[in-house]
Amino acid sequence: MKTYYTSLKKFHTFKINVFAKKIIIVKTIKTLIKTWKKCNQENLPFLLLGKGSNVLFTKNYNGFVVVNRISGITIHEQKDYWLLHVKGGTKWNNLVKYTIQKKIYGLENLALIPGTVGAAPIQNIGAYGVEFKDVCQYVDVLYLNNSKIVRINSNNCLFGYRDSIFKKKHNPNSIILSVGIKLPKTWKPKISHLELQKLSFKNITSHQIFHYICKLRKKKLPNPKKIGNAGSFFKNPIIKKNKAHKIICEYKDLPFYPEPHGMIKLSAGWLIEKCKLKNFSVGNAKIYHKQALILINKNNLATSKNIIKLAKIIISKVKKKFDITLELEVQIIN
């Protein structure tokens, strides 16, 4: 019989009541490596978490959960650019606010995204027309088995839509230690996204875009401090233009976005709503009423089985109606 000692409920935003053998908060590289070695000696699994804002635990974790709190921001000024070296345990939104306070602009579209900087390259986080890859210069990876730090240039990170080399070729013995971000001193607003087109390009400021996006996100997304969730549970599907065209011709109100190589991105939330699943629930797992892309832990009483069952129903319904298979954006931890 396995014994679990520590609740993970406050270490992940879905707030599922699961337990781990041990939870350790690390603030230095030395402590991180020491913890990994101890985990290896005890022959137990090792899982690194930031804010736990993109994960769903399906059961108790029979190993060490290590919470990365190695944080810090260093700014280097060049002639035409600002170069930022940011440690992985830094909260992403704290970084965005910090740069704006320092009059360094370019991250405002990525305001209020939960999680830490170390998670940003894994998912290639993005919102309102900007992705992490657009500002990334490099990613520093720490290999725990030999304590070596390897710098990976942005071009070699294989960034895609909510994807990267760190997701495709995950190495359990490595962690993202820090990232390099490059922002031009000559700032240009990026407001081509459908929800930002109400803003006037003339005289718009980074501060205004930041506050506008914060307002949008607060209006339509649940606060994880109050309602358990992991943000977008599904990716917006990217499909071939001819297939998308057939659906768009039938449904004139379908939001879509052109992608490279003749592909079209469709709104997963819209597809889910068209399957008449708005407010649908399984036990205490429920589709969020303001954004169908988000599954919530109602009253923080849902089980992971509830959430997985709800997700499977959604995938099945969308596949049947539109012949599109939704992919998970949330990382499932078994």
Swiss-Prot record:
Its main location: cytoplasm. It is found in: Cytoplasm. Keywords: Cell cycle, Cell division, Cell shape, Cell wall biogenesis/degradation, Cytoplasm, FAD, Flavoprotein, NADP, Oxidoreductase, Peptidoglycan synthesis. InterPro entries: FAD-bd_PCMH (IPR016166), FAD-bd_PCMH-like_sf (IPR036318), FAD-bd_PCMH_sub1 (IPR016167), FAD-bd_PCMH_sub2 (IPR016169), MurB (IPR003170), MurB_C (IPR011601), MurB_C_sf (IPR036635), Oxid_FAD_bind_N (IPR006094). Pathway: Cell wall biogenesis; peptidoglycan biosynthesis. It catalyses: UDP-N-acetyl-alpha-D-muramate + NADP(+) = UDP-N-acetyl-3-O-(1-carboxyvinyl)-alpha-D-glucosamine + NADPH + H(+). Its EC number is 1.3.1.98. The keyword Nucleus does not apply. It holds the Pfam family FAD_binding_4. Belongs to the MurB family. NCBIfam families: murB (TIGR00179), PRK00046.1 (NF000755). PANTHER family: UDP-N-ACETYLENOLPYRUVOYLGLUCOSAMINE REDUCTASE. This is UDP-N-acetylenolpyruvoylglucosamine reductase. The gene is murB.
